[in-house]
Amino acid sequence: MPANVAKGRTFTESARRAQIVAAAIAVINEHGYAAASFTRIAKQAGLSSTGMISYHFANKDDLIGEVLSEATTVAYNYISPRMEAATGYRAKLRARLESNIELVRAHPGHVRALMEIAQNAPKTPEFVDQRFGLFSGHLRAGQEAGEFGRFNPDAMAVAIIGAVDAMVIGLVHFPEVDAAEYGRELADTFDRATRPS
């Protein structure tokens, strides 16, 4: 079966792909994106050869794309219910920011993998663009609803993303820090920055 065939996979094939993706996440966490070779991933997964990876994934970019999909799905499933429970644009922005930071403690491996891929993989503009669009679109809609003040929503989105990423890096390096408290502080900061004057 060609590596890029997505439909008609057996349960065993799907399980093997999931095993390889989990191993790739572990290797990226331990060694970084650049050193995440098929050889290391095969060893981590307990596979007899790299050919078993190549059977399921056309190349490293194909595998990394699946890792990115898995990590973003985990993040979405964690953040989305918290946003849905909030009412109004300001409350939803707070929920998104707080849950983004708390995600570091809930799913540290997936967060580290996302960071490594976003910073080092050559083919991640779609992920970056989608993330930017989520924030800028939310801010723009909130302005139209009168819940946010006057500011450039694109510039504010860049500032928010930069602050989130910096805080995530800090939390990864300092595991003793209270992520929930940091999330509240971050949300407070941007609530003040975006509220109507």
Protein language model features and the residues they cover:
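N-terminal intrinsically disordered/low-complexity leader segments
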Residues: 1-15
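C-terminal peripheral helix-coil segments that are non-catalytic and often amphipathic
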Residues: 1-4, 102, 132-144, 163, ...
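Helix-turn-helix
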Residues: 19, 27, 31-62, 66
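Hydrophobic alpha-helical connector segments
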Residues: 66, 80-109, 156-160, 183
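Amphipathic alpha-helical packing segments from all-alpha helical-bundle domains
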Residues: 73-81, 106, 121-145, 154-158
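Short alpha-helical scaffolding segments that buttress acidic/His motifs in well-ordered protein cores
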Residues: 100, 114-118, 160, 164, ...
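Amphipathic alpha-helical segments used for helix-helix packing
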Residues: 101-122, 172
